[in-house]
Amino acid sequence: MQNQRIRIR
């Protein structure tokens, strides 16, 4: 899950 890092703000 690479997108999870970018999705979390």
Swiss-Prot record:
Q: What quaternary structure, including any partners, is listed in this protein's UniProt entry? A: Part of the 30S ribosomal subunit.
Question: Per the similarity annotation, which family is this?
Answer: Belongs to the universal ribosomal protein uS10 family.
Source organism of this protein record: Serratia marcescens
Keyword hit for Oxidoreductase: no
The molecule here is called Small ribosomal subunit protein uS10
The reply on keyword Ribosomal protein is yes
User: Keywords in UniProt for this one?
Assistant: Ribonucleoprotein, Ribosomal protein
Where is it found, in Gene Ontology cellular component terms? ribonucleoprotein complex; ribosome
**Coiled-coil ranges (or none):** none
| Role played | Involved in the binding of tRNA to the ribosomes.
